[in-house]
Amino acid sequence: MTEANRILLGVNVDHVATLRQARGTRYPDPVKAALDAEEAGADGITVHLREDRRHIQERDVLMMKDALQTRMNFEMGVTEAMLAFAEQLRPEHVCLVPETRQELTTEGGLDVAGQEARIREAVERLRGCGAEVSLFIDADPRQIEAAARVGAPAIELHTGRYADAHSVAERACELARIRDGVEVGLSHGLIVNAGHGLHYHNAEAIAAIRGVNELNIGHAIVAHALFVGFKQAVKEMKHLILSAAARG
Protein backbone atom coordinates (compact mmCIF):
# COMPACT_ATOMS: atom_id res chain seq x y z
CA MET A 1 0.00 0.00 0.00
CA THR A 2 1.38 3.40 -0.93
CA GLU A 3 1.43 6.45 1.30
CA ALA A 4 -1.14 9.19 0.78
CA ASN A 5 -0.68 11.30 -2.36
CA ARG A 6 1.68 8.77 -3.92
CA ILE A 7 0.91 6.20 -6.57
CA LEU A 8 2.81 3.32 -8.13
CA LEU A 9 3.30 2.61 -11.83
CA GLY A 10 3.20 -0.93 -13.12
CA VAL A 11 4.44 -1.14 -16.71
CA ASN A 12 2.90 -3.86 -18.86
CA VAL A 13 5.34 -5.11 -21.51
CA ASP A 14 2.95 -7.49 -23.31
CA HIS A 15 2.87 -5.39 -26.46
CA VAL A 16 6.63 -5.43 -26.83
CA ALA A 17 6.13 -9.17 -27.21
CA THR A 18 3.20 -8.55 -29.58
CA LEU A 19 5.58 -6.76 -31.94
CA ARG A 20 8.06 -9.62 -31.70
CA GLN A 21 5.46 -12.32 -32.31
CA ALA A 22 4.07 -10.48 -35.34
CA ARG A 23 7.14 -11.56 -37.30
CA GLY A 24 8.26 -14.53 -35.23
CA THR A 25 11.61 -12.90 -34.47
CA ARG A 26 13.69 -12.77 -31.32
CA TYR A 27 13.32 -9.01 -31.07
CA PRO A 28 12.20 -6.74 -29.54
CA ASP A 29 12.87 -8.41 -26.22
CA PRO A 30 10.21 -7.80 -23.54
CA VAL A 31 12.73 -8.71 -20.86
CA LYS A 32 15.00 -5.85 -21.94
CA ALA A 33 11.97 -3.57 -22.05
CA ALA A 34 11.10 -4.58 -18.50
CA LEU A 35 14.61 -3.83 -17.26
CA ASP A 36 14.61 -0.48 -19.07
CA ALA A 37 11.23 0.31 -17.50
CA GLU A 38 12.61 -0.41 -14.04
CA GLU A 39 15.62 1.82 -14.71
CA ALA A 40 13.23 4.59 -15.77
CA GLY A 41 11.24 4.39 -12.55
CA ALA A 42 8.63 1.66 -12.96
CA ASP A 43 7.58 0.23 -9.62
CA GLY A 44 6.74 -3.16 -11.10
CA ILE A 45 6.35 -5.08 -14.34
CA THR A 46 3.11 -6.65 -15.51
CA VAL A 47 2.96 -9.58 -17.92
CA HIS A 48 -0.04 -11.60 -19.07
CA LEU A 49 0.67 -15.17 -20.13
CA ARG A 50 -2.41 -15.89 -22.21
CA GLU A 51 -3.69 -19.36 -23.00
CA ASP A 52 -3.10 -18.77 -26.73
CA ARG A 53 0.42 -17.37 -26.11
CA ARG A 54 -0.26 -14.51 -28.51
CA HIS A 55 2.45 -12.30 -27.00
CA ILE A 56 4.26 -13.20 -23.77
CA GLN A 57 5.79 -16.71 -23.70
CA GLU A 58 6.77 -18.92 -20.76
CA ARG A 59 10.44 -18.18 -21.43
CA ASP A 60 9.82 -14.44 -21.05
CA VAL A 61 8.13 -14.96 -17.71
CA LEU A 62 10.86 -17.22 -16.36
CA MET A 63 13.62 -14.83 -17.44
CA MET A 64 11.83 -11.83 -15.91
CA LYS A 65 11.31 -13.69 -12.65
CA ASP A 66 15.09 -14.01 -12.32
CA ALA A 67 16.05 -10.62 -13.76
CA LEU A 68 13.62 -8.08 -12.31
CA GLN A 69 14.78 -5.80 -9.51
CA THR A 70 11.29 -4.61 -8.57
CA ARG A 71 8.46 -7.16 -8.77
CA MET A 72 6.47 -9.09 -11.30
CA ASN A 73 2.70 -8.78 -11.50
CA PHE A 74 1.76 -12.01 -13.27
CA GLU A 75 -1.63 -11.84 -15.00
CA MET A 76 -3.32 -15.15 -15.73
CA GLY A 77 -6.64 -16.78 -16.46
CA VAL A 78 -8.27 -19.03 -13.88
CA THR A 79 -7.36 -22.40 -15.40
CA GLU A 80 -5.73 -25.48 -13.93
CA ALA A 81 -2.80 -25.20 -16.34
CA MET A 82 -2.10 -21.59 -15.37
CA LEU A 83 -2.50 -22.29 -11.66
CA ALA A 84 0.01 -25.12 -11.92
CA PHE A 85 2.44 -22.85 -13.81
CA ALA A 86 2.06 -20.09 -11.20
CA GLU A 87 2.68 -22.55 -8.36
CA GLN A 88 6.00 -23.43 -9.98
CA LEU A 89 6.84 -19.81 -10.86
CA ARG A 90 5.95 -18.43 -7.41
CA PRO A 91 5.61 -14.78 -8.48
CA GLU A 92 5.31 -12.08 -5.84
CA HIS A 93 2.04 -10.79 -7.29
CA VAL A 94 -0.66 -12.52 -9.34
CA CYS A 95 -3.67 -10.85 -10.94
CA LEU A 96 -6.51 -13.15 -12.00
CA VAL A 97 -8.19 -11.95 -15.19
CA PRO A 98 -10.98 -13.19 -17.47
CA GLU A 99 -9.79 -14.50 -20.79
CA THR A 100 -11.29 -15.62 -24.11
CA ARG A 101 -9.40 -16.49 -27.27
CA GLN A 102 -11.50 -14.24 -29.51
CA GLU A 103 -10.89 -10.94 -27.70
CA LEU A 104 -8.27 -8.44 -28.87
CA THR A 105 -7.61 -7.51 -25.25
CA THR A 106 -9.27 -8.18 -21.90
CA GLU A 107 -12.79 -6.91 -22.48
CA GLY A 108 -14.33 -6.91 -19.02
CA GLY A 109 -13.78 -7.72 -15.40
CA LEU A 110 -13.69 -11.15 -13.81
CA ASP A 111 -17.11 -12.35 -12.64
CA VAL A 112 -16.15 -13.15 -9.06
CA ALA A 113 -19.71 -13.01 -7.72
CA GLY A 114 -20.83 -15.64 -10.23
CA GLN A 115 -18.09 -18.15 -9.39
CA GLU A 116 -17.01 -17.52 -5.83
CA ALA A 117 -16.06 -21.11 -5.02
CA ARG A 118 -13.80 -21.42 -8.06
CA ILE A 119 -12.10 -18.06 -7.46
CA ARG A 120 -11.70 -18.75 -3.74
CA GLU A 121 -9.92 -22.02 -4.49
CA ALA A 122 -7.58 -20.26 -6.95
CA VAL A 123 -6.84 -17.47 -4.47
CA GLU A 124 -6.06 -19.98 -1.72
CA ARG A 125 -3.70 -21.96 -3.96
CA LEU A 126 -1.85 -18.84 -5.07
CA ARG A 127 -1.58 -17.39 -1.60
CA GLY A 128 -0.31 -20.78 -0.49
CA CYS A 129 2.74 -20.35 -2.74
CA GLY A 130 3.43 -16.86 -1.43
CA ALA A 131 1.68 -14.66 -3.99
CA GLU A 132 -0.30 -11.52 -3.21
CA VAL A 133 -3.43 -12.01 -5.30
CA SER A 134 -5.48 -9.32 -6.97
CA LEU A 135 -8.66 -9.72 -9.01
CA PHE A 136 -9.27 -7.72 -12.17
CA ILE A 137 -12.89 -6.64 -11.82
CA ASP A 138 -15.36 -3.98 -12.86
CA ALA A 139 -16.04 -1.14 -10.42
CA ASP A 140 -19.23 -2.90 -9.33
CA PRO A 141 -19.95 -3.08 -5.58
CA ARG A 142 -21.26 -6.63 -6.00
CA GLN A 143 -17.98 -7.78 -7.55
CA ILE A 144 -15.84 -5.85 -5.08
CA GLU A 145 -17.67 -7.37 -2.12
CA ALA A 146 -17.28 -10.83 -3.65
CA ALA A 147 -13.54 -10.20 -4.07
CA ALA A 148 -13.28 -9.47 -0.36
CA ARG A 149 -15.25 -12.63 0.50
CA VAL A 150 -12.98 -14.95 -1.49
CA GLY A 151 -9.91 -13.72 0.36
CA ALA A 152 -8.12 -11.63 -2.26
CA PRO A 153 -6.16 -8.83 -0.55
CA ALA A 154 -6.23 -6.61 -3.65
CA ILE A 155 -8.34 -5.70 -6.66
CA GLU A 156 -7.59 -3.99 -9.95
CA LEU A 157 -10.51 -1.94 -11.19
CA HIS A 158 -11.16 -2.19 -14.94
CA THR A 159 -10.92 1.32 -16.41
CA GLY A 160 -11.77 0.28 -19.97
CA ARG A 161 -15.25 1.77 -20.10
CA TYR A 162 -13.86 5.06 -18.78
CA ALA A 163 -11.09 4.99 -21.38
CA ASP A 164 -13.49 4.16 -24.22
CA ALA A 165 -16.18 6.72 -23.29
CA HIS A 166 -17.45 8.63 -26.32
CA SER A 167 -18.61 11.81 -24.59
CA VAL A 168 -17.65 14.05 -21.71
CA ALA A 169 -20.81 13.06 -19.85
CA GLU A 170 -20.19 9.35 -20.33
CA ARG A 171 -16.60 9.69 -19.18
CA ALA A 172 -17.67 11.65 -16.09
CA CYS A 173 -20.18 8.92 -15.27
CA GLU A 174 -17.57 6.19 -15.59
CA LEU A 175 -15.06 8.19 -13.54
CA ALA A 176 -17.63 8.56 -10.76
CA ARG A 177 -18.26 4.81 -10.89
CA ILE A 178 -14.55 4.10 -10.51
CA ARG A 179 -14.26 6.62 -7.69
CA ASP A 180 -17.15 4.93 -5.88
CA GLY A 181 -15.56 1.54 -6.50
CA VAL A 182 -12.34 2.69 -4.88
CA GLU A 183 -14.28 3.73 -1.80
CA VAL A 184 -16.07 0.39 -1.61
CA GLY A 185 -12.80 -1.48 -1.97
CA LEU A 186 -11.09 0.54 0.73
CA SER A 187 -14.06 0.07 3.06
CA HIS A 188 -13.52 -3.70 2.76
CA GLY A 189 -9.81 -3.39 3.53
CA LEU A 190 -8.66 -4.08 -0.02
CA ILE A 191 -5.66 -2.67 -1.84
CA VAL A 192 -7.13 -0.93 -4.89
CA ASN A 193 -5.25 -0.76 -8.18
CA ALA A 194 -6.60 0.26 -11.58
CA GLY A 195 -5.85 -0.19 -15.25
CA HIS A 196 -6.88 -0.92 -18.84
CA GLY A 197 -6.94 1.54 -21.71
CA LEU A 198 -5.14 4.27 -19.76
CA HIS A 199 -2.87 6.63 -21.69
CA TYR A 200 -1.18 10.03 -21.45
CA HIS A 201 -4.43 11.95 -21.86
CA ASN A 202 -6.74 10.07 -19.47
CA ALA A 203 -4.63 8.53 -16.70
CA GLU A 204 -4.41 11.68 -14.59
CA ALA A 205 -8.04 11.60 -13.47
CA ILE A 206 -7.65 8.03 -12.23
CA ALA A 207 -4.31 8.75 -10.57
CA ALA A 208 -5.90 11.67 -8.71
CA ILE A 209 -8.45 9.43 -6.96
CA ARG A 210 -7.49 9.13 -3.30
CA GLY A 211 -6.82 5.54 -2.34
CA VAL A 212 -5.67 4.21 -5.71
CA ASN A 213 -2.47 2.30 -5.01
CA GLU A 214 -1.16 1.55 -8.49
CA LEU A 215 -1.93 2.03 -12.17
CA ASN A 216 -0.99 -0.69 -14.65
CA ILE A 217 -0.33 0.77 -18.09
CA GLY A 218 1.18 -0.88 -21.15
CA HIS A 219 -0.04 -0.25 -24.68
CA ALA A 220 0.15 3.55 -24.43
CA ILE A 221 3.71 3.43 -23.11
CA VAL A 222 4.85 1.01 -25.81
CA ALA A 223 3.21 3.16 -28.49
CA HIS A 224 4.72 6.41 -27.17
CA ALA A 225 8.11 4.72 -26.97
CA LEU A 226 8.18 4.53 -30.77
CA PHE A 227 8.68 8.29 -30.80
CA VAL A 228 10.56 9.09 -27.59
CA GLY A 229 12.22 5.82 -26.56
CA PHE A 230 11.09 3.33 -23.94
CA LYS A 231 12.78 4.82 -20.90
CA GLN A 232 11.52 8.31 -21.70
CA ALA A 233 7.98 7.03 -22.24
CA VAL A 234 8.04 5.40 -18.80
CA LYS A 235 9.51 8.51 -17.18
CA GLU A 236 6.80 10.72 -18.69
CA MET A 237 4.00 8.45 -17.50
CA LYS A 238 5.51 8.18 -14.02
CA HIS A 239 5.79 11.96 -13.76
CA LEU A 240 2.24 12.41 -15.04
CA ILE A 241 0.59 10.08 -12.52
CA LEU A 242 2.72 11.21 -9.58
CA SER A 243 1.83 14.84 -10.29
CA ALA A 244 -1.85 13.96 -10.55
CA ALA A 245 -1.79 11.99 -7.30
CA ALA A 246 -0.08 14.88 -5.50
CA ARG A 247 -2.76 17.29 -6.72
CA GLY A 248 -5.53 14.87 -5.80
UniProtKB/Swiss-Prot annotation:
GO cellular component labels: cytosol
Localization, UniProt: Cytoplasm
Residues reported in the UniProt entry to bind 3-amino-2-oxopropyl phosphate: 12, 23, 197, 218-219
Enzyme Commission designation: 2.6.99.2
Record Gene3D superfamilies: Aldolase class I
Entry GO MF terms: pyridoxine 5'-phosphate synthase activity
Main localization (coarse): cytoplasm
Name assigned to this protein: Pyridoxine 5'-phosphate synthase
Organism: Stutzerimonas stutzeri (strain A1501)
